[in-house]
Amino acid sequence: MSILLSLLASAVWLVSYDSLGVNRLTAAEDPYAANLIEGGRLGQVLVNYKVENGVWQSLDGRPRRQDGSRYTDTGLGEALVLVQDFEQQADGGFHWAITLENRSPFPIFVGDLAVCIPWKSGGEAPEEIFERSFIKHAFISGDASFLYFTRYSGEAPYLMLVPDKGTPLEYFSTQQRRQYYAYIRSAKSGPQESRGSWRQPHTGETLQPGESRQYGFTWRVAGSYPEMRDILYRSGSVDIRVVPGMTVPRGQEAVFALRMQDAPDSLRAEFPEKTRLRLRESHGDTHLYEVCFEQLGENLITVFFGNGRKTSLEFFCSLSPKELLEKRSAFLTQHQQFRDTGRWYDGLYGVYDMAAGQLRGPDNPDYFDERLTYFLASDDPILGKAPFVASKNAVWPDPSEIESLEYHLEHFVWGGLQRTDEEHPLEYGVYGTPNWYINRHQDLRATQTDYKLETTRTWRTYDYPHVMMLWWEMYKIARDYPSLVRYAPAEVLLERAYQTARVFFLYPKQLLGEYYEPFKWGDYNELLIPDLIDELERCGQPDKAAVLRGQWERKYRYFVYEDRYPYRSEYAADRTAFESTYALARYGLQNGLDPAAARDFMERQHYANLACRGVLEHQWYLLGSDFFGSSDWSAMSYMARMGGWSVLDYGLRYADDPYDWIRLGYASYLGPFGLMNAGDEASGYGYWYPGKEKDGALGQAFTSAKFGRAWIGTEEGRGPWRYCGEGDLGMCAVTRTAAAVLAQDPCFGWVLYGGKLSDDGDRFRFIPEDGVSRRIYIVSDALRVGLSLERGHWSAEVPVVVEKDLSAVRLSVLSDAEAPAILRFECLKGEAVPAVRCGGKSLPAAQDRYGRYCFTLPEGAWAEVDIRLR
C-alpha cells in the first residue's frame, strides 16, 4: 500500500511507504520530482542498550501500521520498545517521532540511539546527477544540529532535517557511502571506535522502569539559504554567522552572531586563559560576541541556552597568513626537494608524510608503488607545488627559494616533465602519469600499460595549467626582480607560459580526444589565461594574445551556451570546475560578451558551487569547505580555497547582496590554513604533528569523521591527511585571493577581513594582514571600490586610513621591486573617480581596458598616497 501524504495536508511533500519504511521523500514543488531517498528507506534506527549491568543488546524496528496521515513503526523487544511515527504537519513539516519505552522492571541504559539518513548521491546522465541527486550537508553540534541537502546544480528547493528540542546530535558514522548514522546518543559506538579523536562527549541515558523518552525530527522545504536560516530560528535552533571565518589568525578578532529564540545563558571558552571572549551587543534576538584566540590549534566555544541545551562552535587559531605562506614555501624548498644528480627525479618537490616525518619519492614510495604511483612524481599531488612556491616569491621574494625553483626547472621540468621547444612534434607538451621518466622511455612504459603505446603520453589536460602557472609566476619574478633570476630572462619565461597555454588547448584533444575535452572541462589554474593574454598585449605581442583569446572565448561559449551543467572536470560532477566557471563568466562580463547570458551563467554556477560547499555548517573544517557527495570522510580539499576565490570575488564585484558571500568566501580563504602543521616553540611547532622538523608541513584534505579511509589509501583519524599531496594546489590560490576587505555588514556593522580595525571617530585605521598586502576592498550598500598594487605592498607599520564617509583613503606603499609600483583603482558599484596625490604632487591617471584607473607611483622604496573620491 502506498500513501501520498502531501495530498492530506499542504501539498508540501510527496511521501510513500512500503514494507521496509518510507521509500519516497520528494518536495512537491520540485520541478524534477527528485526523490531524496531513492533506493533507501527512512525508519532505520539503531539502538544499543543494557538492562541493568547486563550485556549489550540491539533493537531494530520494522514497519507495523499505516493509519491515514500517520505511519507507525513499532519494534518490540522484551525490555525496550521503539515506536516511530511519521506524520505530515499542517505547517508543511514532515515529522518523524521516535519513542523509547522501558517495559522492564529494571533500569535500562541506552548507549546508542542513531538514525540512518539515506540519500541519492549520484547517477550516470547529467540530468540524473544535477537534477535528481543530492549532496548531504551536516552540522553535528548538540542542540543546534541539522542536516540539509542540495541538488548538484544548486537549484532550489533545499531539503532540511531539523531535530526537535531535546534531540541533540553528538556524533556520526558512515558505514557505507549512503548509510549515514546521526547519533542522539553514542556512549557505546563512540568509544568503541578507539582510533582518531572527537571533539564532543559521547553520552548515554538511563530509562527507569515504565519511563519513556521521545525524540524527533522535522523535514522542511526551503527555497533559499536565508529561508534555511529562518527555519533553524523558527525551530528553536541557532542561526549562526561569523566574520572573518572559523579559522582565525592569532591575535585577530572574530565576531559571531547568534540569532535564537532563547537568549544564551552563558558561553565557555575551551582555553579561558588564552581566549578573550565578550558580548559586544544584543539587539532583539541576535547576540554579537567578539573572540580573540592566543592558543594555536582547535578552540571550542560552548554555548549554553534554553534550559540545559548547548552547542559548540569549533574554531581554529592559526599563525598569520604571511607567516604560513613563508613557512610552507620554506618547507617545500628546504625539506621536500630532492637534490641528487644521479636520480632521474633530481629537482622534484616530493610528497611529505607528516606522520612518519619522511619525504616520499620513487625510491621511498611508502605504499604508492602498489597503487597511485603517479602520486610520487606527477599529476596534481606534485605539479601544484612549484607553482605555489613561485606565486609566493612573485609577492615575497626569497633568493634561496628562487634558486630552488630554478633548480627544479633546470633538472626536472624543462626537457623532462615538459618537452622543449626543440622536441618536435609536440613541442612544449607535458608528460602525464605515471611520471615523465617512464613516459619518455618506451620500454619502461610498456611494462606499465599497453594503452596507446604508439601515442606520446602528453594528453592529460590538468597538467598544462599547472606548468603554465609555474612559467607565468617565474616570469613575474624575473620581470619585477630581474637581479634575483639567473635561469632565463623574463621574455623567455613569458614565451614558455604562452606556449604551454597554447598547446593546452591542442594536444589533449589531438591525442586523446575521445576522453579529454579542454573546452568542456574546468581545469584548476587556467583562470590565469586572461592575465597572460593581457600581459602579452602589454608586451607588444597581440598576435599571441589573439590566439589565446580565441581559445578562451571558445571555451566561454561552450560553458555559457552549449551545456546546461558544465560543472565537470575529472568526474561527471566535479567541484574542480568552480574556479573556471566563475572565471569564464567574469571574463564575459568584463569584455562585453553578451552580458545578460554571462550574468545568468554566473548566477547559476555560483549556486552550483555553493551546493558542494559548507555554507551553514559552522565548524572550521566545514564552513567554506568543499566536498563531494558529503563531508563525512573528506573535506577542505584544494577547491575550498580555489572555488572560494570565486565566491569572494562574486561577493565583492557582482552580488546584489554581497555580505553573505564575502563572509563565506573569506572563510574559504582562511579555512585551509588549518591543514598546515605550523606553530612556534610554545606550541611545539605544530598542532597536528608536533616537532620543529615538521613546521610548515601540510595535509591534503581533512577527515571529518572520527576515523576514516582517505581516497589516497591512508587510514586517517579526524584531522588533516598525513600527506600534502594536492593540498599545495589550494595554496596556489592564496596570492590571487588574499585581500583586506572593509565592509559595512548589515549584521556586524563595519568589519575588517584581514587585519585589526581601529575606529577613530571620523575614520577607520588598519594595517592589512591578509598575507599578501596588495589588495583592499571597501564595500558599503552605496559604494564598492577596489585598490590593488602591481609590485610593492601596503605598509606593515603605517596604517591605511579610510574616512567614514568614504571620501578619502590614505595609503603607505613599500616597494622592494626593481620597477615602479602601479596602483589601480576600480569602482565596482556606485560612482567614484579617484584623484591621487603622492609626495604632494598629483599623479596622472590612465584607464585600462577594464575601466580601472592606473597610477604609476614614483620610484623609491616608500610612497605616501592620498586618494580623494569624487
Give residue spans per PLM region.
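Low-complexity, acidic Ser/Thr/Pro/Gly-rich terminal tails and inter-domain linkers that flank the onset
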Residues: 72-90, 223-241, 793
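Solvent-exposed, low-complexity, repeat-rich "mucin-like" stalks and linkers
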Residues: 213, 241-265
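Beta-strand-rich N-terminal accessory domains
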Residues: 10-179, 193, 197, 201-205, ...
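Low-complexity, Pro/Ser/Thr- and charge-rich linker/hinge segments at domain boundaries
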Residues: 123-127, 230-251, 311-353
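C-terminal beta-sandwich/jelly-roll accessory domains of carbohydrate-active enzymes
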Residues: 262-298, 304-306, 727-730, 737-870
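Catalytic domains of carbohydrate-active enzymes that cleave complex glycans
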Residues: 215-216, 344, 348-399, 404-820
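Short acidic, flexible loop segments centered on an aromatic residue
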Residues: 112-121, 188-190, 194, 269-274, ...
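Short, hydrophobic/aromatic-enriched beta-strand segments in well-ordered soluble domains
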Residues: 86, 98-102, 210-223, 305, ...
